[in-house]
Curated annotation (Swiss-Prot):
Organism: Haloferax mediterranei (strain ATCC 33500 / DSM 1411 / JCM 8866 / NBRC 14739 / NCIMB 2177 / R-4)
Full protein name: Chaperone protein DnaJ
UniProt similarity note: Belongs to the DnaJ family.
CDD domains: DnaJ (cd06257), DnaJ_C (cd10747), DnaJ_zf (cd10719)
Residue positions binding Zn(2+) 2: 177, 180, 203, 206
Length: 384
């Protein structure tokens, strides 16, 4: 992958911000370490993130276009360290004499603070929290009703067990870094469109340690991290809704420089049910009854996610009428009761009638003043 940020995203140098963002989304989806099987996916993903960060920031992009890739990267390499230094420390943009100060947020002062970090001495690496890990799981509505435990397999970076995260064998020879003479820093003078700027950066050869080792760990190749899979037990509480997420602190990737682990986020998807439709914590259900039950009324049993429930259907009930079974819906997440079950009645019109049934319906129609014709039964069907 090319180092140039425009090449990394595959866009032209006059690309709009929207084009850059669209290109970033495609590249990020391709190289995300949780998705891609490429060995260098993580490195490519970081390059894509960095390219997007710079090219969608108007001021950083302007600096990048002016300085070029190499100069811009040198200016940003892990910061120049220390703050507070003024012109006397070699940074013409530091201290109270900063000619670009007082311009408000986002001015040139911010640019040089971001790029050169004030210019002065060494800046110690701060503890950083590890990356979060995302996972998705699908459950049935019955599982969401009762609550359930599931094991999910996650893939994440972990501290290398071979070298305990050091990146080298315990018996490796230790040498003073020849690049920085053991200081852990390198000082360079950078020519910018605004003049010469002195930079003190973390030594790339030793990573700021001031020492190097005779060999790298054979397991992690010096990175101190290895990619592993592990099972995590997920507890989904009763009443969980489709699309909600669970957070498990510390189950993500290990932190850097003593920082805490990242977190694990699990998105729960709930499958559609064959009989019930969910609306928040309420459930919708359609229940069929016979024509006589609709006429005379009846007590019927309707299914719920926790067994059967009795429902009284009053005489003269029409198709489409809705009745409520209180507390027969989904549990509330706070544990305080349940939603309701709303039952829509569907009156089933008989299709095949024997002679007695047909005669009874004719008498029913005549008693109601209906003219008995061949279309009577169809009319009854349409009226129900």
């Amino acid at each position: 992958m090319s180092e140039d940020f425009y090449d990394v995203l595959g866009v032209s140098r006059d690309a709009s911000k929207d084009q850059i963002k669209n290109a970033y989304r495609k590249k990020a989806a391709k190289y995300h370490p949780d998705v891609s099987d490429e060995e260098d996916a993580e490195e490519k993903f970081k390059k894509v993130q960095k390219a997007k960060e710079v090219l969608t920031d108007d001021e950083k992009r302007q600096m990048y276009d002016q300085l070029g890739h190499e100069r811009f990267q040198q200016a940003q390499k892990r910061g120049a360290g220390g703050g507070g230094g003024g012109r006397g420390q070699g940074n013409p943009f530091g201290g109270g004499g900063n000619p670009f100060g007082g311009m408000g947020g986002g001015g040139f002062e911010d640019i040089f603070n971001n790029l050169f970090n004030g210019g002065g001495g060494q800046r110690r690496s701060r503890p950083q929290q590890g990356r979060d890990v995302a996972q998705r799981i699908t459950i049935d509505l019955e599982d969401a009703y009762h609550g359930v435990e599931r094991d999910v397999t996650i893939r994440r970076r972990e501290v290398c067990p071979e070298c305990d995260g050091e990146g080298h064998p315990a018996d490796a020879d230790v040498n003073t870094c020849s690049e920085c003479n053991g200081s852990g820093q390198q000082t360079t003078v950078q020519q910018t469109p605004f003049g010469r700027v002195q930079q003190t950066t973390t030594c790339r050869a030793c990573g700021g340690e001031g020492k190097t080792y005779s060999e790298d760990c054979s397991e992690c190749r010096g990175s101190g991290r290895v990619r592993r899979t592990r099972d995590v037990t997920i507890t989904i509480p009763a009443g969980f809704r489709d699309g909600q997420r669970l957070r498990y602190r510390g189950e993500g990737e290990p932190g850097e420089n003593g920082g805490p682990n990242g977190d694990l986020f699990v998105e729960v998807n709930v499958r559609d049910h064959e009989e019930f439709d969910r609306d928040g914590d309420d459930l919708q259900y359609t229940h069929p009854i016979s024509f006589p039950q609709a006429v005379f009324g009846a007590t019927v049993e309707v299914p719920t996610l926790d067994g059967e429930a009795e429902l009284k259907v009053p005489a003269g009930t029409q198709s489409g009428s809705t009745f409520t079974v209180s507390g027969a819906g989904m549990p509330h997440l706070d544990g305080r009761g349940n939603g309701d079950l709303h039952v829509e009645i569907h009156v089933v019109t008989p299709e095949d009638l024997n002679s007695e049934q047909r005669e009874a319906l004719k008498q029913f129609a005549e008693a109601g003043g209906e003219e008995v014709k061949e279309s009577l039964f169809q009319k009854l069907k349409n009226s129900l």
